[in-house]
Amino acid sequence: MASTLQVSSRKCKNCGSTDFVRDISNTTNELICKVCGLVTEENSIVSEVTFGEASNGAAVIQGAFVSANQAHPTFMSHSGQNALMSRETTLNNARRKLKAVSYALNIPEYVTDAAFQWYRLALSNNFVQGRKSQNVIAACLYIACRKERTHHMLIDFSSRLQVSVYSIGATFLKLAKKLQIVKLPLADPSLFIQHFAEKLELGDKKIKVIRDAVKLAQTMSRDWMYEGRRPAGIAGACLLLACRMNNLRRTHSEIVAISHVAEETLQQRLNEFKNTTSAKLSVKEFRDDETEVNEGERSAESKPPSFDKNRLKEKKIKDSLDTKEMLETSEEAVSRNPILTQVLGAQELSSKEVLYYLKKLSERRKAEFSRIKATHGIDGEDLHKTEKDKKRSLDEIDGYSLEKDPYRPRNLHLLPTTASLLSKVSDHPENLDDVDDAELDSHLLDEEASKLKERIWIDINGDYLIEQESKRLKQEADLASGNTSLRKKRSKRTNRNQSSASIVKVQVDGLPLDVSVDDADAVDVVAAGGVKNLLQKTTFSKKINYDAINGLFGQK
């Protein structure tokens, strides 16, 4: 089945005819030229909304809508829910949160778009699942800021999102490893200088301070102070020096508040800059020195701070050792002594490690010296004196003793001991003569004040004392007359295995009676007396003959 139609705006590419026919008998819906039979159109896509009828008679929309930012159409499942709704919802929420954080931190829009692409990659690699969305969003924004070289730091995202900076940093490192981001540029401290200067409110001198701070940062880069340091600490130190150069007093606390580094870190950067050649220049000489900074080359005189630190440590160790037994050059000493090689070759050594290696070295030298004496038969007072001097010089290095704890206080013997303190305390509990306390002395009363206080207390509590005294006198009178209401508690059987004798407790005339019996008749007599006594005390009925109770057990 085919329908004929004429399309004036369409011409056949083969014959130029405008007479076409559409084949609606198959699913391809082809448009064919009637003259030459050329298929000019098939599987045509229309943008009209068409409706169909479901099996239950309901009207349904046929087709799918593809938006401008979608790569696939949105399909509907059997339950009527969107199959791609969850992913699209996650991306939309991420875009909204990225824009909110970017607006709060003044991040440009193009950086936000780049961060959204990083978030899309993280979502495709299943990195978002199981992690806090705030950490992932902050990590994506930080990567985009590092790529675009903006002045934003991790601490800025941490302050805005109220999340731990270490948590964001851990997420950032894992994301960079997951996405294989290996060429992430280092943060330039010059980027943070202008950002920090705006917070200091420098006024008219802000431009001049920024210019001097940037030049100081370039000088520190030439002097090997960039590597291994936080850029915020470098920028804070440069800004502090630039303020001092322009007669603006800014304290360490103000720089710490805007750069988010510790005050010790800031002071350490200043101490490292003090040891450079640029620190010896005056302000005018530093500003006029343009060629050395613009070249950007590190001169041979400038060395990293760690290099000078290790050289000072080596010199300290060499001076502490005995120079008579040291070799002529340090190269020969390093090549012949493996322990000294380990000491001098290490980059960072603590004081305890240095003392440990020196002690090992001294032991080996002592053993070697003893072996040489035993081999050559050398013995004398000079050698004995030399050995004692060597032992004294090796036992104390840098003022520390190898046998004693260098951190133990030396004035502990001046403190009072426990025995001396206890000897001053009197054994008498009421003797307060040895108490030397002005506040306690003010609370102790003399004899007259004590009697006055006693009279006042008796007047206040007189009724209570009279009542207690009357109770005591009444109890004594009752005991003297025998009028007591105390009852003896029933004692438990001391021996449960007694078969020949038993103890029966009955109440006769209000008094307990302990009767020891050996036969059953005596028990019956006691039981009858107890029942009779009970019935006589409490009369249950007038129709009962209480005298007949004596005949219940054969009594007359």
From Swiss-Prot:
* Gene Ontology molecular function, alphabetical: RNA polymerase III general transcription initiation factor activity; RNA polymerase III type 3 promoter sequence-specific DNA binding; TBP-class protein binding; zinc ion binding
Q: Which GO terms describe its cellular component?
A: nucleus; transcription factor TFIIIB complex; transcription preinitiation complex
Q: Where are the zinc fingers (TFIIB-type)?
A: 8-41
Outline the segment boundaries, as ranges, of region: Interaction with TBP and with the Pol III subunit C34.
98-272
Q: Which SMART domains would you find in this protein's record?
A: CYCLIN
What does the UniProt entry say about where the protein is found? Nucleus
| Positions of region (Interaction with TBP) | 284-556
The family database entries (InterPro entries) matched by this protein are listed as:
BRF1_TBP-bd_dom, Cyclin-like_dom, Cyclin-like_sf, TFIIB, TFIIB_CS, TFIIB_cyclin, Znf_TFIIB
Q: Where is the composition biased (Basic and acidic residues)?
A: 295-309
Return the Gene3D superfamilies for the record. 2.20.25.10, Cyclin-like, Single helix bin
Q: Which GO terms describe its biological process?
A: transcription preinitiation complex assembly
Q: Bias regions of kind Basic residues — which residues? A: 486-495
- The ranges of the sequence repeats are 98-174, 193-272
Where is coiled-coil annotated?
none
**What are the transmembrane regions?**
none
**Superkingdom classification of source:** Eukaryota
Q: Does the keyword RNA-binding apply?
A: no
Binding locations of Zn(2+): C12, C15, C33, C36
**What are the protein's UniProt keywords?**
Activator, Metal-binding, Nucleus, Repeat, Transcription, Transcription regulation, Zinc, Zinc-finger
Q: Whom does it interact with, and what assembly results? A: TFIIIB comprises the TATA-binding protein (TBP), the B-related factor (BRF) and a 70 kDa polypeptide.
According to its UniProt record, which protein family does this protein belong to? Belongs to the TFIIB family.
Functional note: General activator of RNA polymerase III transcription. Interacts with TBP. Binds to Pol III subunit C34 and to the TAU135 component of TFIIIC.
Q: Which PANTHER family match?
A: TRANSCRIPTION FACTOR IIIB 90 KDA SUBUNIT, TRANSCRIPTION INITIATION FACTOR IIB-RELATED
Q: What is this protein called?
A: Transcription factor IIIB 70 kDa subunit
